[in-house]
């Protein structure tokens, strides 16, 4: 449509060769979906984002319920446009920057969301997907969120719930051991879940922070905008 209006890149760059022209589309100019209408949740589905939103407490995957694909596309457009402007400063030449939403979303999602599909050799270990370990933790009066990204932090979680011996157990004491035996990862999760149910949210967060484990409350929108931080 833009070409029919006489405002396409080829037409305008003929007038101004230094032009940086940015095109944003759902699927790009080629491919079987190139003429389809599209919005954010459709891109989430096609890029695999929805399938990786796995909550063990819910038997099916779910959307990221905000504009995940739209915003990742906007960030990509900003970066690509800045790079094109720098290239023009260095070379004097303009260019056509094409950003399909499906490409931008996939690039943004891939490093962690698809890590198991990155190294596919027979001897490769894709590790534990974040979608299987990012969970809310239920306490006696609500839910909190924490994440242990190292062996030291995992031991800190065990200490925070009053069971430092769990962090010393060879089944749980290293990420290598847990990755090699995923059933132990599940077992430790069940043990910790039971321990957190005996603590309230404030107690749990204080204990985790004391153990130097990243943690915090699950705030409502209203609570978030008045949080002192």
Predicted features, each with a name:
Residues 1-2, 194:
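Short strand->helix junction
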Residues 3-149, 159:
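Active-site-adjacent "lid/gating" segments in soluble enzymes
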Residues 26, 222-223:
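Conserved beta-strand edge residues that scaffold enzyme active sites
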Residues 29-31, 175, 225:
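Generic structural signal for helix capping and beta-alpha/helix-loop junctions
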Residues 34-35, 178-181, 227-229:
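Short secondary-structure transition/capping segments
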Residues 85-89, 196, 225:
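Hydrophobic residues in alpha-helical segments
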Residues 123, 130, 223-229:
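Active-site-adjacent capping/gating segments
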Residues 133-211, 215, 222:
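Aromatic-enriched alpha-helical interface/lid elements that frame and gate functional surfaces
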